[in-house]
From Swiss-Prot:
GO CC terms of this entry: cytoplasm; ribonucleoprotein complex; ribosome
InterPro entries: bL21-like (IPR028909), bL21-like_sf (IPR036164), Ribosomal_bL21 (IPR001787), Ribosomal_bL21_CS (IPR018258)
Originating organism: Thermosipho africanus (strain TCF52B)
Keywords, sorted A to Z: Ribonucleoprotein, Ribosomal protein, RNA-binding, rRNA-binding
GO biological process: translation
Function: This protein binds to 23S rRNA in the presence of protein L20.
Record's subunit section: Part of the 50S ribosomal subunit. Contacts protein L20.
Alphabetized GO MF terms: rRNA binding; structural constituent of ribosome
Family indicated by similarity: Belongs to the bacterial ribosomal protein bL21 family.
Domain of life: Bacteria
PROSITE patterns named in the record: RIBOSOMAL_L21
The protein's name: Large ribosomal subunit protein bL21
Amino acid sequence: MYAIVESGGKQFRVEPGKVFFTERVVGKGEGEEVKLDKVLMVKTDDGKVLVGKPYLENVEIKGTIVEHGRARKVIVGKFRPRKNYRRIKGHRQWYTAIKVEEIQVK
């Protein structure tokens, strides 16, 4: 069984027992339970596919926050030839790792 959920403006394929990385979830600590309510699609174990318009109302996905962290640094550089102009800037994006506990179809 798997589901397609929307979190942080992006879509993820999630399965029970798997961990996925999304944009930072503010207000929740590590070990706390979260509910993912923006479910776009679910495929059950017997092959039945449920598609929402845009979201499914009768599906509930429960997960646990594993960690909050920051991704690897992305280096951005500006350069102008022959003018001795070079600027380098780094960025590290915050993320939240969520482990999916169960997918319930009501």
